[in-house]
Design a protein with these regions (language model features):
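N-terminal and secondary-structure boundary signal
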Residues: 2-3, 19-276
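Intrinsically disordered, low-complexity segments enriched in serine/threonine/proline/glycine
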Residues: 12-20
Length: 276
């Protein structure tokens, strides 16, 4: 595959998804200069950014959106002054030295606490994600000392809303939407961008039953393509560049047989989880 570096850096390479060559994938960043406020129309802001970049959405593109702007638009920013910590939150705060109000939010956003240590709380969120601090985050938010951002309540629904609204405004273009967040990983340092909500794309590409290059039949290989797309998008997003939206162009993804797709397909059942 060829990744156009000029597109990652903000260049102006154009072209339909179908005329870039079979082995070319483009990563196209879209900057949003204004801070997102509750009830902001993300579709309008994305279209404005596309116009400023002299770009457009094509059929088969993948629109990757950082959850932070979705959460802000959906009013998922919490004023910590309004949070009253429970006895459990105060107990954990005394042990770990973490703000008890943040702990209260983490517990509210979780259905199970797996463990906590050194200021990190590993939980199973209400969505089913296993992650640190339930995605509760104080970065890239105004007055971060007193505010925190939560994950969208239903990121699949958020992705579908963005997709349908943009399809209506782009003449019915058929593209996918992935909403992302950065998660840590067991046994490896560093975080990676992963999908937390999807629309118009199957999250897994299965090679089960296919033969490898030497004819051996594959039995278990399934690739979480939406996570890999999310990680590719992070190369252009970063954390400081005001690039919360990226277009991935040229990747041939599988569309769902039914109209809807769900991130829940990526969540491993507890009985198959060897790490808990």
């Amino acid at each position: 595959m060829v990744f156009h570096a000029d597109c990652v850096d903000g260049g102006e390479r154009k072209g339909d998804n179908n005329d870039n060559g079979k082995d070319t994938i483009q990563i196209i960043p879209l900057r949003l200069s204004a801070d997102i406020r509750p009830n902001d129309e993300l579709d309008t802001l994305i279209l404005r950014s596309l116009e400023q970049r002299q770009e457009q959405i094509f059929d088969n593109d993948v629109l990757v959106v950082a959850h932070k702007i979705v959460s802000k638009a959906e009013g998922r920013v919490v004023n910590l002054e309004h949070i009253k910590p429970s006895a459990e939150s105060l107990k954990i705060a005394a042990e770990d030295g973490k703000d008890a109000r943040i702990i209260e939010l983490i517990l509210d956003e979780s259905k199970d606490m797996i463990r906590h240590s050194n200021g990190v709380i590993i939980v199973e969120t209400r969505h089913g994600f296993i992650c640190a601090n339930a995605g509760v985050d104080q970065s890239n938010v105004e007055d971060s000392i007193n505010h925190a951002v939560l994950l969208p309540v239903d990121a699949d629904a958020s992705a579908n809303k963005i997709r349908e609204s943009l399809r209506e405004k782009t003449g019915g273009k058929d593209f996918a939407v992935i909403i992302t967040d950065t998660f840590g990983r067991p046994f490896r340092e560093g975080q990676t961008n992963v999908a937390i909500g999807i629309a118009g794309i199957e999250p897994i590409k299965s090679y089960v039953g296919s033969a490898d290059m030497y004819g051996k039949k594959l039995r278990v290989t399934e690739i979480a393509v939406v996570d890999e797309i999310a990680s590719a998008a992070e190369l252009a997003m970063g954390k400081l560049e005001r690039v919360p939206v990226v277009i991935i162009r040229g990747y041939k993804y599988q569309k769902p047989e039914k109209e809807s797709s769900a991130i829940s397909k990526l969540i491993r059942p507890k009985e198959k989880d060897l790490f808990r």
